Regions:
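Duplex nucleic acid-engaging cores and interfaces of nucleic-acid transaction enzymes
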Residues: 23
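Residue-level signal for helical boundary/lining positions with a hydrophobic bias
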Residues: 28, 58, 126-128
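Short secondary-structure capping/junction motifs at helix and strand boundaries
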Residues: 46-54, 93-98, 149, 194-196
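FAD-binding subdomain of flavoenzyme oxidoreductases
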Residues: 63-175, 179
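Glycine-rich N-terminal segment of FAD-binding domains in flavoprotein oxidoreductases
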Residues: 1-18, 27-32, 36-54, 67-72
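A broad, structural surface signal
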Residues: 36, 40-44, 125, 142, ...
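Extended alpha-helical targeting/anchoring segments
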Residues: 55-60, 65
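Cofactor-binding catalytic cores of oxidoreductases
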Residues: 1, 69, 153, 173-202
């Protein structure tokens, strides 16, 4: 599968009118792409994966099919970024699976891929984390996000009411002063203004 390394974006008549997000962040990667190669291609476009494990030598279908997860705060494991699955189901049969509740591409694209478009939530979810038992994954359509940089910041804090609230209900309202300190440090380090928002807690 390592020779299957085509990737492309979709736009215009290839995107379902019901897809309500930014289609420039949709990318299809064939099964031979490793995460390291995907990250190189995404960086050129100013984009990043929504989730990633600690090893970037695996192929994209490998991490998705085994439910590899990262440490994103408000996002789940790698399968959650997948919105389309191109499956080889037999010697002369291919399907392109999407959720019926979340249409992304049009039949025009799947026809060009030589696959039958199937929209079914249960089938999609079954094939998503299937450990390779649902067919051969030819490629995956994924959603991405804007490129970002993570910086480690550690500080010992007492286990008080504010910390307990953050842990149990993800309410960080007791940390506004600390986040302001992080903003100031990040602004100095990066030489451009960095502002903390709820969306920053990704």
């Amino acid at each position: 599968s390592k020779n299957l390394r085509r990737f492309f974006g979709v736009s215009g008549s290839y995107v379902d009118p019901g897809y309500g997000k930014d289609s420039t962040k949709l990318l299809f990667f064939e099964c031979g792409y490793t995460l390291s190669k995907i990250n190189i291609e995404l960086k050129k476009k100013g984009l990043s994966l929504l989730a990633c494990g600690s090893n970037n030598g695996q192929t994209l279908p490998g991490v998705v099919s085994t439910n590899t997860h990262g440490s994103a705060f408000k996002f789940g494991a790698t399968p959650e970024m997948v919105v389309g699955i191109h499956l080889i189901t037999g010697p002369s049969s291919q399907v392109y699976l999407e959720r019926a509740s979340y249409p992304v591409v049009t039949k025009k694209l799947t026809d060009e891929l030589g696959a039958e478009l199937v929209r079914d939530d249960a089938l999609f979810n079954a094939a998503l984390v299937s450990f390779g038992s649902f067919g051969i994954i030819r490629g995956l359509m994924i959603e991405t996000r804007d490129l970002f940089l993570l910086h480690l910041s550690r500080k010992f804090r007492p286990f008080n009411e504010a910390l307990e609230k953050a842990i149990t209900s993800l309410d960080f309202s007791g940390f506004t002063t600390y986040f302001k300190e992080l903003e100031d440090r990040a602004t100095d380090r990066n030489q451009f203004p960095v502002t903390f928002t709820e969306e920053s807690l990704y």
